[in-house]
Design a protein with these regions (language model features):
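Glycine/serine-rich phosphate-binding loop and adjoining beta1-alpha1 elements at the start
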Residues: 84-182
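Solvent-exposed alpha-helical segments within well-ordered globular domains of core cellular machineries
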Residues: 33, 72, 99, 120-123, ...
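A glycine-rich (often HGG/GG-containing) alpha/beta subdomain
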Residues: 1-110
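Gly/Ser/Thr-rich helix-start
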Residues: 8, 115, 193
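Short, well-ordered alpha-helical scaffold segments within catalytic/effector domains
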Residues: 25, 29, 164-171, 195-196
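Active-site-proximal beta-alpha loop/turn segments in soluble metabolic enzymes
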Residues: 66, 156, 202
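Glycine-rich phosphate/diphosphate-binding loop of Rossmann-like nucleotide-binding domains
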Residues: 171-224
Length: 224
């Protein structure tokens, strides 16, 4: 019986590869069902953000076989040859998988240590898997404990003190270079959560003009 975490992140892969392996939210229910079919049962949660794509799973089969099945699922689902993504994958088994989830949820493994978004992202991933009934008692207890540990870390340390996010740090850097953004034009690429956070940070700093570039005009208009 094994608990595993298989995935890649900003530590191990390029943004281009993470985008190829990304699971858009609307595809995750179908992906979870397909993964569960491939595993012949078991439990799984898919966490997919701009900085990481990870699958957490629990099954009666041994951890090595479980990782093999998850690897095969990722390649099949995204139609990407193993040679193009497997070298960037990490595989954590047993206690290592548990420790990895705790570090990720507490933002200790984030691009910006202490950022608050990851806790919500992990919670959303867990709730979506729960809605699809791909979570068992073991994964449920594991994730609930991870949420508790993450909140304890934020409460008992100053890891999240101040404005801690990639968006806020990027805007702070711009201010440190240009001093005043009132007469500046800034382009934001993408209208996802990161783009939205950046937009809010820029508006709070009094930026003069914002250009929003996005594949979908409709989504860009909603954010605008």
């Amino acid at each position: 019986m094994g608990v595993v975490a298989v995935g890649l992140s900003h530590h191990t892969s390029s943004l281009a590869l993470r985008e190829r392996l990304h699971f858009p939210p609307e595809t995750i229910p179908a992906a979870l069902r397909e993964l569960q079919n491939r595993l012949h049962g078991g439990a799984a949660v898919i966490l997919s953000t701009c900085n990481r794509v990870e699958i957490y799973a629990h099954h009666e089969k041994d951890a090595v076989a479980l990782c093999d099945d998850i690897r095969a699922f990722i390649g099949c689902w995204h139609r990407i040859p193993d040679s193009e993504f497997v070298p960037s994958l990490y595989e954590h088994k047993g206690p290592e998988a548990v420790g990895h989830l705790f570090r990720v949820t507490a933002s200790l493994d984030s691009l910006v240590v202490g950022e608050a978004q990851i806790l919500g992202q992990v919670h959303e991933a867990f709730m979506l898997a729960q809605d699809q009934q791909t979570v068992d008692k073991v994964l449920s207890a594991l994730f609930q404990r991870a949420f508790s540990v993450a909140k304890q870390v934020r409460t008992e340390t100053r890891i999240g003190a101040g404005k801690v996010s990639v968006a806020s740090i990027a805007v702070d850097l711009a201010v440190s270079i240009f001093i005043d953004l009132a007469d500046k034009t800034v382009m934001i690429v993408g209208s996802g959560k990161m783009g939205e956070s950046t937009l809010k940070s820029l508006l709070a700093r009094g930026v003069g003009r914002i250009l929003l570039v996005n594949r979908s005009a409709e989504k860009a208009l909603v954010l605008a």
